[in-house]
């Protein structure tokens, strides 16, 4: 007897595959003015992501803002309860805030978006398309920026130095807007303290897909990234990724030692021949002052490297979470 074969399709064949999840980490620091507009744009982005079979996870990290940023974040959560809010106990800096946000990522792909609206949220859609196409790492490089001339100059110098000393091939316009596969998450979460997230992600490799965009003009508030913070950021980046300064010091020391040996030999021979005249006190004093200052500068450079080692091994947390609203 032949058994009856059911003509109805199997239950599994009609089941839809669940959407993938895209997580966006948004560090917030004195961004009360831009948050309503940012959320409005992200709502549009979320709808367009769903058309790509992607759900959106929003993770806002309030980095000790002294304005009404936290209140604005609560308004966003009221409208969209799935939004995650991480409130830090004080200001720890954008790197620490970003890495704290990474700890709450649950998506298949994750990225970083500035809260000041200078980076267009719609750029996330194009990056998502490249991730769907198979790229694990997608970055959006600034081709131009509508910032004050001093800010543009300092940024240009910064990225030139980074490309020369730290990471040859690093995009000249720099980038903060990026999308990464979840396979990269563990590397970033476990990176050492004060590590430049964008540069470290680039250093990891993964053959990034590079997109381009024009950075918007700031419409709300003012930049809190002061000259002092820019300098500290540069020092942390160089000392965290490159041994070039120490090697330059070593090469310079060898050159000075060789020249000193030659000059010392000349003095000894001149003295033995009776042709030695003590002159040039002003020149000698200037040289001593110059090399003393240079030695102190080199000690400072070594101190920066030693400080990074100390910061990496001590038990002080990179950031302290005060409250979470998940």
Listing of model-derived features with the role each one plays in the protein:
Residues 88-90, 94-104, 121-195, 216-235:
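Acceptor/aglycone-binding surface of glycosyltransferases and processive sugar-polymer synthases
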Residues 84-86, 169, 209:
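Structural signal for short hydrophobic segments within the conserved structured cores
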Residues 2, 9-21, 199-326:
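Hydrophobic helical membrane-anchoring modules
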Residues 78, 103, 129, 133, ...:
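Solvent-exposed polar/charged
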Residues 9-147:
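Structured catalytic core of nucleotide-sugar glycosyltransferases
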């Amino acid at each position: 007897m032949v058994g009856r074969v059911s003509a109805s399709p199997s239950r599994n064949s009609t089941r839809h595959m669940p959407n993938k999840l895209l997580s966006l980490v948004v560090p917030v620091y004195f961004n009360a003015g831009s948050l309503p507009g940012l959320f409005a744009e992200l709502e549009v982005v979320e709808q367009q992501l769903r058309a790509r079979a992607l759900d959106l996870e929003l993770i806002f990290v309030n980095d000790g803002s002294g304005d009404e940023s936290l209140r604005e974040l609560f308004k966003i959560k009221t409208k969209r309860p799935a939004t995650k809010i991480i409130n830090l106990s004080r200001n720890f800096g954008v790197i620490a805030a970003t890495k704290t946000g990474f700890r709450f990522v649950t998506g298949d792909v994750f990225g970083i978006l500035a809260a000041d609206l200078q980076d267009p949220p719609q750029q996330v859609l194009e990056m998502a398309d490249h991730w769907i196409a198979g790229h694990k790492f997608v970055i959006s490089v600034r081709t131009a920026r509508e910032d004050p001339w001093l800010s543009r100059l300092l940024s240009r110098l910064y990225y030139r130095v980074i490309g020369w000393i730290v990471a040859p091939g690093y995009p000249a316009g720099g980038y903060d807007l990026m999308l990464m596969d979840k396979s990269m998450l563990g590397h970033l979460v476990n990176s050492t303290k004060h590590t430049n997230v964008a540069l470290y992600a680039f250093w990891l490799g993964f053959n990034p897909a590079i997109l381009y965009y024009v950075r918007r003009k700031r419409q709300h508030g003012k930049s809190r990234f002061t000259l002092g913070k820019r300098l500290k950021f540069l020092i942390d980046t160089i000392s965290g990724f490159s041994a070039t300064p120490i090697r330059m010091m070593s090469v310079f020391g060898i050159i000075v030692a060789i020249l000193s040996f030659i000059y010392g030999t000349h003095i000894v021979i001149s003295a033995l021949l009776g042709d030695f005249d003590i002159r040039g006190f002003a020149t000698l004093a200037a040289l001593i002052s110059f090399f003393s200052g240079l030695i102190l500068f080199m000690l400072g450079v070594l101190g920066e490297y030693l400080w990074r080692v100390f910061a990496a091994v001590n038990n002080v947390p990179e950031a302290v979470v005060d409250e979470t609203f998940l």
